[in-house]
């Protein structure tokens, strides 16, 4: 190969790399890399209690699956004490915004809200089937972690809730749900007793609201779980599913 040919090939390679990089930068759906999520989890000001929770939640994989980016606007449904709300606050940074929906605000959430990292968070104390004000829409991401099953025994209109979540998202926005797995035949009947819900039951309810199923993740699956015990006293690690849905463009 001549020097001229080598030079021409090198220029073509540089051009291809440059174009690919430009496309990646321009693509607003490109996720933060997993390495960045690991750095978020390792931040020194996170509490020891949250680090204990990390051991069963696998937050690096969970955040990677969401694809959350700096500057995104996120709603964390069933936020509870704010573990996942804080993770999202760290992901989206000061240019982003996180809303944490709770049916009633827990003392642990109030304490957490005093942390500087939560300055970009607003707590919404609202029923799950009316989770956001009517003027809040165009969100990039909704998360709903280990609390959907609770709505099965709380008198929540889940069809209304799911439609409200759909309306709050921008076209192309994502919904990521994780929950404790029940046997298929148990459906929603063990939400209160075992704190579980059948994966296909949940998926069907979400799709009925207009969401398109995108992907599932396996990093919290435990096939050795018989799924016949309450999750807090399960004899094995709890089998949990993680699902991603999208609002069509």
For each predicted feature, which ranges?
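Core SAM-dependent methyltransferase catalytic element
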Residues: 226-249
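Class I SAM-dependent methyltransferase Rossmann-like catalytic core
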Residues: 37-62
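Conserved class I S-adenosyl-L-methionine
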Residues: 71-80
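A conserved beta-strand element that flanks and buttresses the S-adenosyl-L-methionine
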Residues: 143-147
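Class I SAM-dependent methyltransferase SAM/SAH-binding core
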Residues: 81-131
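A short glycine-rich, Lys/Arg-flanked "PGG" loop and its adjoining helix->strand segment in the class I
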Residues: 158-171
């Amino acid at each position: 190969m001549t020097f001229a040919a080598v030079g021409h090939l090198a220029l073509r390679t540089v051009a291809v790399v440059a174009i690919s990089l430009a496309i990646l930068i321009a693509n607003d759906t490109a996720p933060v890399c997993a390495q960045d999520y690991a750095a978020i989890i390792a931040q020194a000001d996170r509490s020891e209690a949250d680090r204990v929770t990390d051991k069963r939640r696998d937050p690096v994989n969970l955040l990677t699956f969401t694809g959350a980016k700096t500057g995104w606007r996120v709603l964390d449904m069933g936020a509870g004490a704010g573990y996942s709300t804080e993770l999202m606050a760290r992901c989206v940074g000061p240019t982003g915004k996180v809303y944490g929906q709770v049916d009633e605000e827990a003392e642990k959430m109030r304490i957490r809200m005093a942390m500087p990292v939560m300055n970009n968070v607003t707590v919404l104390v609202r029923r799950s089937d009316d989770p956001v004000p009517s003027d809040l829409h165009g969100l990039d991401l909704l998360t709903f972690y280990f609390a959907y099953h609770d709505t099965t025994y709380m008198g929540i209109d889940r069809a209304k809730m799911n439609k409200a979540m759909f309306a709050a998202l921008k076209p192309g926005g994502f919904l990521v749900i994780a929950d404790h797995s029940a046997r298929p035949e148990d459906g929603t009947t063990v939400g209160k007793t075992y704190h579980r819900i059948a994966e296909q039951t949940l998926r069907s309810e979400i799709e009925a609201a207009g969401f398109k199923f995108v992907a599932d993740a396996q990093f919290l699956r435990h096939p050795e779980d018989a799924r016949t015990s309450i999750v807090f006293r399960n004899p094995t690690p709890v089998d949990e599913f993680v699902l991603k849905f999208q609002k069509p463009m």
